[in-house]
Amino acid sequence: MSMIRNITICCLLLLLNVAAQAQETTDSVTTDSVSTQTTKQKLMARLNQVQQLLDTKARAKVDSNYIEVPKKPWRVVLRYKESVYDVDYSNSVGSPAAGDGMDWEMRFEPPLSASLGVWAGYRGLGLSVAKSLGRKKGTSLSFSCTGAKYGANLRLRGFDIDEATLTGTIYEGGQVLHGTSDAHFRAPVSIASIYLNGYYVFNGRRYSQAAAYNQAVIQRRSAGSLLLGATWYMAALDYSDDMNTGMILLSRNIGRINVQQGNIGVGYGYNWVPFRGFVVNAMAMPAICFYNRMKVYKYDSNYEIAESEGQVDDYGQWNPDTHTWANGKTHKPIPIDDDDTSWYGTVDSWEVGSETTFSMLRFNVNLRIGIAYNWSNYFIGLQSQFNNFNFKKDQCKVNLYDAWARLSFGVRL
């Protein structure tokens, strides 16, 4: 409840700030100067009351010998970030255990993604917007709320990629063949994620998780604390475009994957302060996944993978209304190793349904390292974080690795 109350107060603070500035502009053009001045004074008085409340709450619950609350509450930060986001999706086609089929793994491993963004906030509340640099475009939004005893972060991210690594093991006629190749998607694959994290600090009077990550406060002496944390993670992988039909056929006709996970864990964080203004933080939190759901969307098309190469009969034209070829058949075979790609021009695919499965309890991990140095009204920081989320059901496995490193420079106002 304290977190919700602080968020509400911050929103009110920002709205009052905007209203006060708008009212000040109106003062220069209005003819009713007395009434306007009175309204402005009331707004500014209310704004000061809210600011004083937040400032008082920021100082009331900490030991000033260990944690310093800066006098200037506003912070504006310029951030440069390098991100890594890997998705490993593996499955089986046929019956590999019986010696006839294929195990395969598709790995989306985009190169390091660089982004530049701005973070702005008041005390422990802030909002950031970042835009990807270079060829791989994407946008990231995040909201953070931290206090002496708690913290919460919400991160939204989305980007497109058209490359993956495909590793396969083929079982046929008693032979086992291994192979790895680069897969180039003819249409971009869309990847989006939502990450919500919250934690409780048992030793909040002397230890601040925020000191090394958003510089809401300054850690004056070394201290550590047990942490109780929870995360909610959602990821969506979409390669259902008609031009990606070949990969959909290899994926058991799956064209979209949605994963949702809820995790809870207990960890430990420590702030080391070798000299004034400088802090090094390390945090590790193993977590148990108590909710693990994967929903896949199945697609059908007018093509199917042929079991062997050979002459393909004349199928004529495809009728999208009846979902049949001119010869009455519904699927035209294509050899899996056929180099002829002209058939892509006649692909027609459509969604036919979805399947939802739940995985057993899984173990994930959340690791963080942060360094910050504060001087005068300025600060500089270097932070990194690693998250792992995984799903397993029968022959289907999904592993997601989400990591980033960030360099930031900010000023207190």
Give each language-model segment a name:
Residues 81-98, 155-194:
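Outer-membrane beta-barrel translocator/channel fold
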Residues 101-104, 138, 179-187, 213-214, ...:
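Extracellular loop and loop/strand-boundary signature of outer-membrane beta-barrel proteins
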Residues 107-110, 119, 133-135, 188-190, ...:
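Short sequence motifs at beta-strands and strand-loop junctions characteristic
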Residues 39, 70-76, 114, 123-125, ...:
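Outer-envelope beta-barrel architecture signal
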Residues 78, 116-122, 141-147, 196-202, ...:
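Residues on the lipid-exposed face of transmembrane beta-strands in outer-membrane beta-barrel proteins
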Residues 88-95, 140-142, 165-170, 210-213, ...:
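Outer-membrane beta-barrel translocator domains and adjoining extracellular loop/strand segments
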Residues 57-73, 203-224, 274-280:
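Short loop/turn motifs that connect adjacent beta-strands in outer-membrane beta-barrel proteins
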Residues 89-95, 102-105, 117, 126, ...:
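Outer membrane beta-barrel transmembrane domains
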